[in-house]
From Swiss-Prot:
Keywords, in A-Z order: 4Fe-4S, Cytoplasm, Iron, Iron-sulfur, Metal-binding, S-adenosyl-L-methionine, Transferase, tRNA processing
EC number: 2.8.4.3
Subunit structure: Monomer.
Similarity comment: family membership: Belongs to the methylthiotransferase family. MiaB subfamily.
Domain TRAM residue range list: 381-443
Pfam families according to UniProt: Radical_SAM (PF04055), TRAM (PF01938), UPF0004 (PF00919)
SMART domains (alphabetical): Elp3
One GO MF term: 4 iron, 4 sulfur cluster binding
Protein name: tRNA-2-methylthio-N(6)-dimethylallyladenosine synthase
Gene field: miaB
Length: 449
């Protein structure tokens, strides 16, 4: 067997891609190893969404270069993902120790690229946008890694937000065939997977070809979620990341009529200022976003809302930032992710006037995060005394402790036997912190027996 080490940066889609890279390489005799030093092939699966993430990649490659030299050149280094797509030849120029560079739509070609590299012939670079070919070429079954799994259903983005590199690194929106998604999900369920998270850059833009036996028009995400909920063993369904422009009535209704859909919605808004939303090319207003949340909560009153925010976008005034703070107060988030604006080469926002100083961006980020932490702490504390169904995902740090996730995606720690792993159990919440809950085991839910 040959050793394979994969370092994954960035989003859940990259985590999924890394899992599929392992699937692609398994027939070639590659098996995962714990450290890069013991690997014959190291794959760095990269993120290009912010400058800091890109620089982490180059730092990692410097360390791998030294390991490769120490191994006498035995190690093969491959760079995959969005940095590979965006920088291509520049990446090879900056770090000649890299053997292979492949974009996120080309990892099904990795076996061929490895073969070419071993013979020192052919191109070291693959960055074509052939998403359909990629999904057709991937192994139809996957090896599950625990009771929860990601399933990619959509890739690419047609929205062209002015701050974002995704349309340039992931390509146009493309949805997988429903039959292929169902086959993959059934395979995972047969291995004990209880929860799936449907992935896409704009997952609620999903319009996948309908099942062959049913025909008709392309299916929406709401239709897909209802269908997947009928697969035996699949008891929980989530999806991420969604866009307000694609939050249609049927998907909102599915949150109310499909019990397997978890009461958790991650719907990024980025700003509460209409002026900044327009400059970002988001295609919606703050009030439109508020209306979506109102309708989702009407369909599923117990739903928890999550979001993403960018502070310090070019031209953002004090009034614009206050509009964001007011939106946060109005909505009340269970959790949210916030970042300083990071200029990305090649995006329209990078060429805009009015870039803010780091000190202003820092101050605004601190203020926003303080408010978001307060809301997250309050939401977690509101669970104390409640009994929640928890999907057990493994052992905790302490002896006799297990951990899992609540319907609201909170980490939950409780004492219990090891054989609960993979089951859904009832846990009474007795404590809460910013990032997790603690509880007492009540019973194993009937569906898990």
């Amino acid at each position: 067997m040959k050793g394979l080490f994969i370092r994954t940066y960035g989003c859940q889609m990259n985590v999924y891609d890394s899992e599929r890279i392992r699937d692609v390489l398994r027939p070639l005799g590659y098996a995962p190893v714990e450290t890069p030093e013991s690997a014959d092939l190291v794959v760095v699966n990269t993120c290009h969404i912010r400058e800091k993430a890109t620089e982490k990649v180059y730092s990692e490659l410097g360390q791998l270069k030294r390991m490769k030299e120490a191994s006498g050149g035995r190690m093969t280094i491959a760079v995959a993902g969005c940095v590979a797509q965006a920088e291509g030849e520049e990446l090879i120029r900056r770090q000649p120790a890299v053997d292979l560079v492949l974009g996120p739509q080309a990892y099904h070609k990795l076996p061929e690229m490895i073969a070419r590299a071993s013979r020192a012939i052919g191109d070291r670079l693959e960055t074509e946008f052939d998403t359909v070919e990629k999904f057709d070429a991937l192994p139809k079954t996957r090896e599950a890694d625990g009771p929860a799994a990601f399933v990619s259903v959509q890739e690419g983005c047609d929205k062209f937000c002015t701050f974002c590199v995704v349309p340039y690194t992931r390509g146009a929106e493309m949805s997988r065939r429903v039959d292929d998604i169902v086959f993959e999900t059934r395979s995972l369920a047969s291995q004990g997977v209880r929860e799936i998270t449907l992935l896409g850059q704009n997952v609620n833009a999903f319009h996948g070809p309908a099942p062959v036996l049913e025909g008709g028009e392309d299916w929406t995400l709401g239709q897909l979620c209802r269908h997947l909920s009928k697969i035996g063993g699949i008891e929980r369904i989530r999806y991420t990341t969604s866009h307000p422009r694609d939050m249609d009535d049927d998907l909102i209704a599915a949150h109310g009529d499909t019990p397997a859909m978890m009461p958790f919605l991650h719907l990024p808004v980025q700003s509460g200022s209409d002026r900044i939303l327009k400059a970002m090319n988001r295609g919606h207003t703050a009030d439109h976003y508020r209306d979506i949340i109102t309708r989702v909560r009407a369909a599923r009153p117990d739903i928890a809302i999550a979001s993403d925010f960018i502070v310090g976008f070019p031209g953002e005034s004090d009034a614009d930032f206050e509009a964001t703070m007011q939106l946060v107060r109005d909505i009340g988030y269970a959790i949210a992710y916030s970042f300083k604006y990071s200029s990305r080469p090649g995006t329209p926002a990078a060429e805009m006037h009015g870039h803010l100083s780091e000190s202003v961006k820092d101050a605004r980020l601190q203020a926003l995060q303080a408010l978001l932490r307060e809301q997250q702490t309050e939401f977690n504390a509101s669970q104390i005394g409640k009994t929640l169904p928890v999907l057990v995902t493994g052992k905790g740090r302490n002896a006799g402790q297990m951990h899992g996730r609540s319907p609201y995606l909170q980490a939950v720690h409780f004492e219990g036997p090891d054989d609960l792993n993979g089951k859904i159990v009832d846990v009474k919440v007795i404590g809460a912190s910013l990032n997790s809950l603690t509880g007492e085991l009540v019973r194993v839910a009937e569906a898990a027996l």
